[in-house]
A protein has these predicted regions:
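C-terminal domain-tail junction helix/linker
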Residues: 159, 180-233
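An active-site-proximal beta-strand-loop segment
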Residues: 67-96
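Mobile genetic element proteins and their domesticated derivatives, centered on retroelements
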Residues: 2, 16, 32, 68, ...
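Short small-residue beta-strand/loop micro-motif enriched in glycine and branched aliphatics
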Residues: 95-99, 162-164, 188
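Active-site beta-loop-alpha junctions of metal-dependent nucleic acid enzymes
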Residues: 98-126
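RNase H-like two-metal-ion nuclease catalytic core shared by retroviral integrases
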Residues: 129-131, 140-144, 148-155, 159-184, ...
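A short acidic/small-residue loop/turn micro-motif
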Residues: 90, 102-106, 143
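Basic, flexible linker segments flanking DNA-binding modules
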Residues: 1-73, 133, 145-148, 226-230
């Protein structure tokens, strides 16, 4: 069963484990990884890991939500236009919300925020972004005294706004990693013919993705972890 499905999921072992588990596979994710490394993959010499400063872990859903924009890959767009995926990742549960737009501007960012607040199953205390002009005017010398539409909307909602340091995308690492996962699990396997078509496909993927286990959640899904928190909040 592993040998038959491995070629399809070799770049995403969590998806392989989830697929096998639905078919009655009982070994743990780590057990599956050990089997594959021993029997199916050549040994790879690991380089020394970089040591970063400790990062304060979010203790409850909504305490901090990372938001970022991803360029939709041109190889899956048939009409030659440019599209952008807005993504929000809750640091505590890894619950994720995504939408697609045909521009990345402060107007699109504000619209995404409105929809995020409506769809979020928890109250959002703080939002973190990079310093892109679709979010903030802070790096524009002529406009730095005036907040963007996105920033003003955050004020209206009473949501704390945090901008990461310039040129440190790792500080928004959870949403950055989710974008890499979305590239492999979604965009490399889809074709979109219009903005409406892309939005429908992304909406289905968004619902499905929150039920996929994650190693950082002890092999539970974001929805499973979220339900545990909501039961005691």
């Amino acid at each position: 069963m592993i040998l038959r499905r491995y070629p399809r999921y070799k770049d995403d072992l969590m998806m392989l484990w989830n697929s096998l588990r639905k078919s009655g596979y009982t070994r743990t994710y780590n057990g599956l990884v050990r089997f594959i490394r021993k029997h199916l993959e050549p040994e790879i010499k690991k380089s020394a890991a970089r040591k970063n400063k400790p990062y304060a872990r979010a203790e409850y859903p909504g305490q901090k939500v990372q938001v970022d924009v991803k360029f939709v890959p041109s190889y899956c767009v048939t009409n030659g236009k440019k599209y952008y995926q807005y993504t929000a990742v809750d640091e505590c549960t890894r619950w994720t919300y995504r939408e697609m737009y045909d521009e990345h501007s402060t107007y699109s960012s504000a619209q995404f925020l409105v929809n995020l607040v409506k769809k979020s199953p928890f109250l959002i205390r703080e939002i973190q972004t990079d310093n892109g002009t679709e979010f903030t005017n802070a790096l524009l010398q002529k406009s730095c005294e005036h907040k963007s539409l996105f920033e003003n909307l955050l004020d209206n909602y009473g949501i704390i706004y945090h901008r990461i340091r310039v040129a440190t995308p790792r500080h928004n690492g959870k949403v950055e990693r989710q974008h890499r996962i979305d590239e492999a699990r979604f965009y490399k396997k889809m074709r979109m013919y219009s903005l409406e078509d892309g939005r429908k496909q992304l909406e289905r993927y968004n619902l499905r993705s929150n039920d996929i286990p994650k190693t950082c959640l002890n092999y539970r899904s974001p929805n499973e972890v979220l339900q545990d928190y909501l039961a005691i909040m």
